[in-house]
């Protein structure tokens, strides 16, 4: 039986995390991986598919699942709940798949209690300007939404040094290849360029 691997990827909104995960899953290396599908209470978007992107449920049902301790981890963000259920993860593990988790740092900590060998990857934007452009395009210049997302992004990156690997997404294909390298070699020194990352963090945290 093959040895399964478990990876959590975190990133501020608009950094390209979801696209990187989806593209990786369609590569030869990604064939043995599955994405752990989260539950959420937010509305489904036109391009999304129930059970593939998320399990979309009501807030009442989500709260019931919290009460019944059915989540490994959950969070409340921008007026909606998001969570990883024990059932989803156990079913994927039982099917002998390696797993990707799309969660924030608190989620990483909780999942690591359940799966100690979880490896965490944090993805940063190349610059604050680049991130603002992506957020602007995504949220149609809604100033209130932009400010909320940017405030959360500054909180997200404060935990960057608690991850196993840190990548700066300057180029999509290059970042994708680095994720593959992490999975193949798990060589931290080959990936983390600490001085460059620290300098990027300082710039990203500037007002």
Swiss-Prot record:
Q: Does the keyword GTP-binding apply?
A: no
Question: What is the designated name of this protein?
Answer: Guanylate kinase
What's the superkingdom here?
Bacteria
Query: What's its job?
Result: Essential for recycling GMP and indirectly, cGMP.
Tell me the protein family, please. Belongs to the guanylate kinase family.
**Chief location category:** cytoplasm
Task: Name the coiled-coil region(s).
Answer: none
Q: What class of enzyme is it?
A: transferase
One GO term in the molecular function aspect is: ATP binding
Domain Guanylate kinase-like span(s) in chain numbering: 4-184
**GO cellular component labels:** cytosol
- Give one Pfam family, short name only: Guanylate_kin
């Amino acid at each position: 039986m093959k040895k399964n691997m478990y990876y959590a990827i975190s990133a501020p909104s608009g950094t390209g995390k979801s696209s990187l995960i989806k593209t990786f899953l369609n590569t030869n290396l990604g064939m043995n991986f599955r994405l752990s599908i989260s539950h959420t209470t937010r509305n489904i978007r036109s391009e999304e598919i129930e059970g593939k992107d998320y399990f979309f449920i009501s807030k009442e049902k989500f709260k019931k699942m919290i009460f019944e301790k059915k989540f490994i981890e959950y969070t409340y963000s921008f007026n909606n709940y998001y969570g990883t259920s024990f059932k989803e993860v156990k079913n994927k593990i039982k099917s002998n798949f390696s797993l990707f988790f799309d969660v924030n740092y608190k989620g990483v900590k909780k999942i690591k209690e359940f799966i100690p060998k979880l490896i965490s990857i944090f993805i940063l934007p190349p610059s604050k300007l680049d991130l603002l452009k992506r957020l602007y395009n995504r949220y149609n210049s809604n100033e209130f939404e932009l400010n909320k997302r940017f405030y959360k992004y500054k909180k997200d990156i404060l935990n960057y040094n608690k991850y196993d690997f840190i990548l700066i997404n300057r180029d999509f294909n290059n970042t994708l290849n680095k994720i593959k390298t992490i999975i193949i070699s798990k060589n931290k020194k080959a990936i983390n360029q600490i001085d460059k990352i620290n300098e990027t963090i300082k710039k990203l945290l500037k007002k």
